[in-house]
């Protein structure tokens, strides 16, 4: 069965609970390209969304080893926490330059600000060997 990741993006856009449910359904798929497709589509959505939302998005895919290794998980969460603290002290006076690569502007800074959701998702991947 083919899964259209854009449906999951739309579901998340409407309701975070639906996104979690869809993520659980996605988790049941044994073929890893489903995860890659979903992650790529979600990241593309986050990268291209225009609007008044200034927050950044993060997608985290973790396998069983990461989930079972409490030290690495704690380290990872600590790293995320430190990044949030560092972001809090950054200067808002200087606008960030974002680059959108198209045929018209190869590498020129975009004057349009990029906007993404604030997302941190942990998707557990079960190996059914």
Curated annotation (Swiss-Prot):
Residues covered by region (Disordered): 86-116
Acidic residues bias locations: 86-96
Protein family membership: Belongs to the asfivirus D129L family.
Sequence ranges of Polar residues compositional bias: 103-116
Domain of life the protein comes from: Viruses
Protein name: Uncharacterized protein D129L
